[in-house]
UniProtKB/Swiss-Prot annotation:
Belongs to the RNase PH family. Gene3D superfamilies: GHMP Kinase, N-terminal domain. The lineage of its organism: Bacteria, Bacillati, Bacillota, Bacilli, Bacillales. It is an enzyme of class 2 (transferase). It comes from the Bacteria. GO terms for molecular function: 3'-5'-RNA exonuclease activity; tRNA binding; tRNA nucleotidyltransferase activity. InterPro entries: ExoRNase_PH_dom1, ExoRNase_PH_dom2, ExoRNase_PH_dom2_sf, PNPase/RNase_PH_dom_sf, Ribosomal_Su5_D2-typ_SF, RNase_PH, RNase_PH_bac-type, RNase_PH_CS. PANTHER family: EXOSOME COMPLEX COMPONENT, EXOSOME COMPLEX COMPONENT RRP41. One of its GO terms (biological process) is tRNA processing. Keywords: Nucleotidyltransferase, RNA-binding, rRNA processing, Transferase, tRNA processing, tRNA-binding. The gene is rph. It comes from Listeria welshimeri serovar 6b (strain ATCC 35897 / DSM 20650 / CCUG 15529 / CIP 8149 / NCTC 11857 / SLCC 5334 / V8). Transmembrane segments: none annotated. It catalyses: tRNA(n+1) + phosphate = tRNA(n) + a ribonucleoside 5'-diphosphate. The keyword tRNA processing applies. This is Ribonuclease PH.
Length: 248
């Protein structure tokens, strides 16, 4: 049994509140246990300079944390005048993951910005951001589709992310909270599509190694968790949008 009473293969309680903000084309509040992230999607009718005139779209992401999202206050990055390496890495990860399931040609010459703002952190902020940002992005694209239907719906598949790890006394586990993540011998983030394809695997031994058997166990746990997350996404988005993603 884990510190919060979960079994090794159990996600934390997932709660998604759609249309959490009134202004963005798509938005959700996603809660993964005590980790809470607001994800919003904004549509711009322009693309980055390097893509102008190509007729293709772009997906980009920004990530930030409230100063007191953690147990001690952090200085706002805007006050420092620069984005930290960690933030830059996570922003690129979110954007890269979302672009993997979007047909940028079908999107047309527009940019969708995903803003992921962590209001409370208890481990897994980047994976929660990806899972929530996907829902917000699809909501925004669905609104465009309602205005002028796409010949081909730009979203090709579902996408979700979770964490897995190896604990000294608990073995392989799914969806680590902060206490578990801090003590983990191995920490891995897994991003997958609804069809079971991998988008990214980020795994690291923390002063430890892991075996091929443990790797297989971690991947199996991740696949189980992501499958459950995608079912939640489908429930939030509804049958009509789910059918559009499936090409029906």
């Amino acid at each position: 049994m884990r510190v919060d009473g979960r079994e090794k293969n159990a996600l934390r309680k997932i709660e998604v509140t759609p249309d959490y903000l009134m202004h963005p084309e798509g938005s959700v509040l996603i809660a993964s246990g005590n980790t809470k992230v607001i994800c919003s999607a904004s549509v711009e009718t322009k693309v980055p300079p390097f893509m102008r005139g190509e007729g293709r779209g772009w997906i980009s992401a920004e990530y930030s944390m409230l100063p007191r999202a953690t147990n001690t206050r952090n200085i706002r990055e805007s006050s420092k005048g620069k984005v930290t390496g960690r933030t830059m890495e996570i922003q690129r990860l979110i954007g890269r993951a979302l672009r993997a399931v979007v047909d940028l040609d079908a999107l047309g010459e527009r940019t969708i910005w995903l803003d992921c703002d962590v209001i409370q952190a208890d481990g897994g902020t980047r994976t929660a951001s990806i899972t929530g940002a996907f829902i917000a992005m699809v909501m925004a694209i669905a609104k465009l589709d309602e205005q002028v239907p796409f010949t081909k719906f730009p979203v090709k598949d579902f996408l979700a992310a979770t964490s897995v790890g190896v604990l000294e006394e608990g073995g392989t586990v799914l969806d680590l909270n902060y206490i578990e993540d801090s003590a983990a011998q191995v920490d891995m983030n897994i991003i997958m599509t609804g069809s079971g394809a991998f988008v990214e695997l980020q795994g690291t031994g923390e002063e430890a190694t892991f075996s091929e058997t443990e790797l297989a166990e971690l991947i199996a746990l991740g696949k189980k968790g992501i499958s459950e997350l995608i079912e939640i996404q489908k429930e939030i988005l509804g049958d009509k949008i789910t059918a559009r993603i499936k090409g029906e």
